[in-house]
């Protein structure tokens, strides 16, 4: 199981629209490659159809190859739909990958099983597959009910906790804070992994 974070990296609303379009495209590619995608967290932009960032999980035999094809800088070439007279046509987003050793923190996590709620059909409503996991040392807690089995939810919970711990460590590091402020600049100067064109988000 892999986590991918899509980020506009403090870019303008056009970059946030690019995040939304990239996420939609990624989900379609995952479906074609039999990779299960779960959208875990999103931060909306100024407009309803935009995303400042999105955190997703990928699971399946082709998950690594799919993530490899997306990680890095993504370029979107399109006139601004929000500022018609704006001269800029190149917009960028960044996609980062996170994996963790599933056994590394298993002893430091307390699990509670819960009855799943919300959409998911009869199977979800009749099983206690949802999991709340708490990292004892930090107090970080996550609830996962997106997978169909308790085992899969525990795997995703461990990965989410590991990701949140890394984010916490980054926030506590002055040097890494500085690196994150430079992220947008680095994205724009980097060679794009993939390039898409127009509102239809066509690759080429």
UniProtKB/Swiss-Prot annotation:
Residue span of region Linker 2: 162-179
Region: Linker 1, residue numbers: 99-107
Family matches, as InterPro entries: Pep_chain_release_fac_I, Pep_chain_release_fac_I_sf, PrfH, Prokaryotic/Mito_RF
Gene Ontology biological-process annotations: RNA repair
The keyword Nucleotide-binding is assigned to this record: no
GO terms for MF: rRNA binding; translation release factor activity
UniProt-annotated stretches for the region rRNA-recognition domain, C-terminus: 180-204
UniProt region (GGQ domain), positions on chain: 108-161
Region described as rRNA-recognition domain, N-terminus: spans on this chain: 2-98
The UniProt record lists the keyword Flavoprotein: no
Keywords assigned by UniProt, alphabetized: Protein biosynthesis, RNA repair, RNA-binding, rRNA-binding
Motif range (GGQ motif): 120-122
Similarity comment: Belongs to the prokaryotic/mitochondrial release factor family.
Subunit structure: Found in the A site of damaged 70S ribosomes, but not in undamaged ribosomes. Contacts (damaged) 16S rRNA, 23S rRNA and ribosomal protein uS12, but not mRNA.
General function of this protein: Peptide chain release-like factor that acts on 70S ribosomes with specific damage to their decoding center (cleavage of 16S rRNA between adenine-1493 and guanosine-1494, E.coli 16S rRNA numbering). Probably acts as a peptidyl-tRNA hydrolase, allowing release of the nascent chain and dissociation of the 30S and 50S subunits. Can release mRNA as short as 19 nucleotides (nt, mRNA-19, which has a single amino acid in the P-site and only a single nt in the A-site) from the ribosome. This specific cleavage is inflicted by CdiA (ECL_04451) or by colicin E3-type (ColE3) proteins.
Entry remark concerning the domains of this protein: Folds similarly to release factors 1 and 2 (RF1 and RF2).
Alphabetized PANTHER family for the sequence: LD18447P, PEPTIDE CHAIN RELEASE FACTOR HOMOLOG-RELATED
Protein name: Peptide chain release factor homolog
Organism: Escherichia coli (strain ATCC 25922 / DSM 1103 / LMG 8223 / NCIMB 12210 / NCTC 12241 / WDCM 00013 / Seattle 1946)
